[in-house]
Amino acid sequence: MSTPHSDSAFVRACRGERTDVTPVWFMRQAGRSLPEYREVRGTGTILRAIADADLATEITLQPVHRYGVDAAILYSDIMTPVHAIGFGVDIAPGVGPVVEHPFSGRDDLERLRPLDPAADTPYVLETVRNLVTELQVPLIAFAGAPFTVASYLIEGRPSRTYVRTKALMHTDESLWFELMDRLADLAIDSLRSQIDAGAAAAQLFDSWAGALSPADYERFVLPASTKVLGAIEATGVPRIHFGVNTAELFDLIAAAGAEVVGVDWRTPLDRARSRVPAPTSLQGNLDPAIVAAGWEPTRVAALDVLRRGGGNPGGRGGHVFNLGHGVLPETDPATLERVVELVHSTPPGAATEETAS
């Protein structure tokens, strides 16, 4: 099936095809590290900026113009669909998603009505349509995976322990699976609408899946993520599945159905590749904190990532260069500019231990 930008290095690497250059983009490449972002964002809220299609378009384009990355990712938030259906979510500066009335029981299922993208998130569709007419690189659609979104709804804000989430999971399986099913449908409807509007790839963010044991992930989370990724398979766009601290889950994350598994900085890419079936591609995995430390440590670490990414060794899968999580606010944009130059100037498979020292 022909899809937008199907001949681009990014899409080809996602599909496990060999490329002449390693494609690169950065999670949170549009954001607080960019002075031009801070200038246009002003003092309004993130959700208000997302709802302004012209502003969201400009913010999405900023890192593409500055860095010369090989893909853009829509400026939005994984909680946008839940906010749009009126669940009562805000994005608090320095905190993250905050839920006014957290999910606590079966009655709250009624608050999770189906998403009608044309009516509930028309600004997202307008932003995507704006971008596909202006971009020369693929646009990545994205959504929050059911578990990560559920954790915010249940905990009420970011959590380190996920006590309430795991308690619901283990004490009321019926309610848990109904919640996951509804959140899967929200993600599906959001992703399909972005893809129909012209996005060329899709990333499912299960940021906090690493808080789970393999057994809990397989039983309580994998079915819903598989449902989401399976529902968009027919669109033909490559699918990326990313979580943080998921080394023990790589085989299960790959089993959910994406062409690409995102890897954080904790696991070397060559080790990650041994844990996923061929020809699964990998995305990652430069440590964002090292990038914030300046150029020389970044150069060494980036070359090591390229060496371990391997340029599709033996046809086992492609490599999309990225950070292991989002760009930190204190990152110097000039360092990321140099990372892109380095990645593009190093032929796939050419980095060695000597070049990385």
Where are these regions (language model features)?
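Alpha/beta enzyme core
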Residues: 157-208, 214, 218-231, 235-238, ...
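Conserved, mostly hydrophobic/aromatic
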Residues: 23, 64, 131, 187, ...
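N-terminal basic, low-complexity leaders that serve as flexible interaction/assembly modules and, when applicable
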Residues: 1-93, 227, 311, 333-357
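Catalytic-face loop-and-helix region of soluble metabolic enzyme cores
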Residues: 230, 234-357
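Structural preference for beta-strand elements that scaffold enzyme active sites
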Residues: 19-21, 25, 71-73, 138-140, ...
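Active-site-adjacent beta->alpha loops and helix N-cap segments on the catalytic face
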Residues: 121, 212-225, 265-279
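Active-site-proximal, glycine-rich beta->alpha crossover segments in alpha/beta enzymes
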Residues: 90-190
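Active-site mouth loops of central-metabolism enzymes
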Residues: 42-56, 162-189, 287-297
